[in-house]
């Protein structure tokens, strides 16, 4: 009898003890409905919170900050499928996968804000050099779009000072007066299986949906110091679709004497573009291959020099080159299928435009020939020019089929 009374008295203590263990083993509850969850490499939940569909940024940013703390190693951040408004740019974190499968995020910033950015001084209080701001980050799936009425001329995604970043299967939609995504000072950054669609109030002069840009503080990539001359290297755009845009992917502007190195644009589909599908400016060791370009104003533009027009060329302030002027492109444009026609932005359609020459005007003095470029195996259907080239040296043009 005494043992029974002892058991009854101790039972609540035993239950409380086991409940405490259960809570300690699972510190965050799963939320029904809209939520964001952070799991570490073992699958343990390290953060979970409900997300307000009208203002998802606070909860999402807290999840990203949990990863950025570094306390849990490489993590996966998952958002419950649904549609959410982002009223402030969310700062991405290193060492994570952000899974947005089934998620639509709407850029609802009151000003020129974005949906996602890499860390910068405004948000972290730090300047970043080289490729140190964001590393080992994957953005998977999801749709990035604009809230109704947002015509503020802002990008959906801006990345700078970043390394080993992959954007996989994400849709970028309905940009007005800007780019869908911008990248500067990136190393081993990949856009694969992405969709870029819908663009208004832009012109051929500066309208790439995916802009591979220069890290210049005043006109092209403000708010991402340090401005240390870091260039893009090993950038890959593969198996993406670009449709109903002004321009597709590439670079307009240049630092004289600095180069975008190792850009690969492969296996993409471009259709119904008013301007140029692929723009290469100061590219070396580049590969442009197996792309399908249909109903566009121009297929591929490759510049090593431009003295006037829309391109911005930046020097050291006294008109001298930054770094060393390159004399070897070491690039190839091969096995592309291109169909071009006259558009509202391109009254003289061309399959390809390859441009080098002696500098004058904006460029420091020198010869910027297109040297050692291979253009072969391309099929071009055009209502205007086929392949137009200026100052091509030691280049190979072979087995290209042009139909008018």
Give residue spans per PLM region.
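Solenoidal tandem-repeat scaffolds enriched in leucines and small polar residues
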Residues: 167, 173-262
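Sec-dependent signal peptide cleavage junction
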Residues: 23-34
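N-terminal extracellular ligand-recognition/capping segment immediately after the signal peptide
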Residues: 72-114, 119-122, 144, 172
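Parallel beta-helix/beta-solenoid
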Residues: 99, 118-152, 156-175, 192-195, ...
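Short glycine/acidic-rich loop motifs that flank beta-strands on beta-rich extracellular proteins
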Residues: 86-89, 107-113, 147-155, 176-183, ...
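Acidic Gly/Asp/Thr-rich repetitive segments characteristic of extracellular carbohydrate-active
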Residues: 42-80
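Short, T/G/N/S-enriched strand-turn elements that build extracellular solenoid repeat scaffolds
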Residues: 60-69, 85-94, 108, 127-130, ...
């Amino acid at each position: 009898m005494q043992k029974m009374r002892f058991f009854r008295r101790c039972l609540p203590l035993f239950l409380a003890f086991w409940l405490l263990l259960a809570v300690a083993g699972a510190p965050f509850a799963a939320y029904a409905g809209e939520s964001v969850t952070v799991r570490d490499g073992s699958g343990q939940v390290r953060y979970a919170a409900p997300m307000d569909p009208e203002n998802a940024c606070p909860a999402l940013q807290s999840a990203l900050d949990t990863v950025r703390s570094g306390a849990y190693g490489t993590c996966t951040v998952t958002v419950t499928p649904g549609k959410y408004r982002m009223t402030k740019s969310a700062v991405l974190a290193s060492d994570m996968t952000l899974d947005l499968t089934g998620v639509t995020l709407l850029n609802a910033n009151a000003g020129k804000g974005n949906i996602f950015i890499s860390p910068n001084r405004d948000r972290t209080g730090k300047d970043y050099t080289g490729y140190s701001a964001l590393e080992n980050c994957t953005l998977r799936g999801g749709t990035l779009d604009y809230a109704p009425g947002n015509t503020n001329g802002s990008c959906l995604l801006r990345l700078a000072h970043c390394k080993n970043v992959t954007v996989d299967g994400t849709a970028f939609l309905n940009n007005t007066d800007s780019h869908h995504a911008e990248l500067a000072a990136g190393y081993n950054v990949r856009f694969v299986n992405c969709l870029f669609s819908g663009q208004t109030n832009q012109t051929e002069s500066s309208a790439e949906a995916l802009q591979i840009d220069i890290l210049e503080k005043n006109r092209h990539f403000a708010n991402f110091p340090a401005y240390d001359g870091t260039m893009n290297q090993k950038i890959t755009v593969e198996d993406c679709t670009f449709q109903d845009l002004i321009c597709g992917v590439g670079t307009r502007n240049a630092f004289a004497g600095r180069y975008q190195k190792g850009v690969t644009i492969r296996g993409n589909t471009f259709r119904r573009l008013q301007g140029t599908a692929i723009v290469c400016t100061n590219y070396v060791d580049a590969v442009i291959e197996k792309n399908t370009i249909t109903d566009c104003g121009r297929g591929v533009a490759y510049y090593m020099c431009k003295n006037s027009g829309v391109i911005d060329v930046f020097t050291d302030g006294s008109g001298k080159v930054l770094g060393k002027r390159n004399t070897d492109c070491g690039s190839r444009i091969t096995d592309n299928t291109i169909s071009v026609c006259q558009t509202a932005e391109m009254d003289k359609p061309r399959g390809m435009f390859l441009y080098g020459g002696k500098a004058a005007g904006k460029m420091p003095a020198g010869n910027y020939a297109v040297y050692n470029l291979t253009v072969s195996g391309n099929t071009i259907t055009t209502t205007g020019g086929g392949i137009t080239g200026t100052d091509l040296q030691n280049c190979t043009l072979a087995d290209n089929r042009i139909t008018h």
